[in-house]
């Protein structure tokens, strides 16, 4: 999970 923050950000979209 290197882009965990990006995953959460895109998850909201």
Swiss-Prot record:
The modification Methionine amide is found at residue 13. The keyword Lipid biosynthesis does not apply. Belongs to the tachykinin family. It comes from the Eukaryota. It comes from Phoneutria nigriventer. The keyword Secreted applies. Its main location: secreted. GO terms for cellular component: extracellular region. Keywords: Amidation, Pyrrolidone carboxylic acid, Secreted. Expressed by the venom gland. It is found in: Secreted. The lineage of its organism: Eukaryota, Metazoa, Ecdysozoa, Arthropoda, Chelicerata. The modification Pyrrolidone carboxylic acid is found at residue 1. PROSITE patterns: TACHYKININ. This is Tachykinin-like peptide-XI.
